[in-house]
Amino acid sequence: MQTLNRRNFPGRQHPDRVIQFGEGNFLRAFVDWQLDLLNEHTDLDAGIVIVRPIDSDFPPALDTQDGLYTTIIRGLNEQGEAVREPRLIRSVNREINVYRQFDEYLALAHDPNIRFVFSNTTEAGISYHADDSLSDAPPVSFPAKLTRLLYERFCHFDGAADKGWVLLPCELIDYNGVALKELVLRYAAQWKLTPTFTAWLNDHNTFCSTLVDRIVTGYPRAEVEALQQEMGYQDTFWDTAEHFYLFVIQGPQWLAEELRLNKLDLNVRIVDDIKPYKERKVAILNGAHTALVPVAFLAGLDTVGESMDDALIGKFVEKTIAEEIVPVLDLPHDELTSFAQAVLSRFRNPFIQHQLLSISLNGMTKFRTRILPQLLTYRERHGELPARLTFALAALIAFYRGERSGEGDTLQTYPLQDDAHWLERYSTLWAGVKENTVSLAELVNVVLRDADHWEQDLTQVPGLAAQVTEQLQTIVERGMRAAVEGYC
């Protein structure tokens, strides 16, 4: 069987125009996949040089396949049909290990054609390392490595205005472009680089904050043999991802022309402020996940897909999003409903087995950040509590009992994953309920009164403790399926 490389699979190679910090599955099935589409369908003509930002030889470099690899995009499309789209990605030219090839790394700054810089160095990647210096080869932190490269470019081109870069970090932190620029400027000051360099950074480089959204499931270990037979070649870098993707860029509108986004209809938005899109994602996608988990799991289900296929639970999720989350968000209604429909399709993706227990990690914090803002805003705007969101809170409290109904009259226990103080508190409270020394109302009040966690005393929200207590009582006495029926 043939090995995947450019000799066996010749095709067009594009000039280096993009630097990418990070070689992981996400960027390869998100940024590199989109650039490959733009290269095929427009005149973008942009090749990518990947910079491996950490000192590691695992996985092997993409150079072993001349930068080629295959994506398998699969899920439900906009019509609700299951689709599967293999694609040979040709946008990556080569990979540089900054720790082994530092001179080649600096040489990237000398290339007049380089225009864009993408990165995904994990949430911890955009961070400050006090000991980093200009003379390090390389510095430790990603922002310091980038500052060194930018300074090399500034010096090589004598501060030319047209040699600045467009920087699009994809790390999952708020306003990632702002954070990255702040650290680059901090290193410039710490290293006592010239004021003209700082002016060049500010005036001729564009740092964009981004929001990225796609579930990338990565290397499909169990399917490799079948994929090799189907495609007719060996690929060490198979990369699988869902059909849905969204790339929101907070930046100038001229980016659409530079990236040729005006010539191909990709799901990329260039906006003035990324915040409403972040709130939409957190509230609808993450919020629906968080509301779903305890309800579905206590109803006897184990995966997101099973839950959405269940008539009762699927309807609960749909109504929660449509009637209690979407109405309180500040974006055009059409955009919100379209995104909500995409979320429901993603939840129903038959190619992804998303375990409810894996999503349950740190459920208390997730409820505070993902659902509580909508719950409180709904009450403020409508003068009443959103019944399904409060039911999700009651279900979450019930979930921390650590047991659900099994076959017959048996109880099934399961692992709980949260901060130790919550696990200890719930263990004590639920033991008290079992021994009739703590009432459900007392349990709910203890949970809601924790101002350190909720950042306020939720027992002061009129009617909340009473409503959650009543809903919890129904769950305990009648079981989850009977309890949730009234909200479907």
UniProtKB/Swiss-Prot annotation:
GO terms for biological process: D-galacturonate catabolic process; mannitol catabolic process. GO terms for molecular function: mannitol-1-phosphate 5-dehydrogenase activity; tagaturonate reductase activity. It comes from the Bacteria. Pathway: Carbohydrate metabolism; pentose and glucuronate interconversion. It is an enzyme of class 1 (oxidoreductase). It catalyses: D-altronate + NAD(+) = keto-D-tagaturonate + NADH + H(+). Pfam families: Mannitol_dh, Mannitol_dh_C. Transmembrane segments: none annotated. NAD(+) binds at V18, I19, Q20, F21, G22, E23, G24, N25, F26, L27, R28, A29. Its EC number is 1.1.1.58. Keywords: NAD, Oxidoreductase. GO terms for cellular component: cytosol. NCBIfam families: PRK03643.1. Belongs to the mannitol dehydrogenase family. UxaB subfamily. This is Altronate oxidoreductase. It comes from Pectobacterium carotovorum subsp. carotovorum (strain PC1).
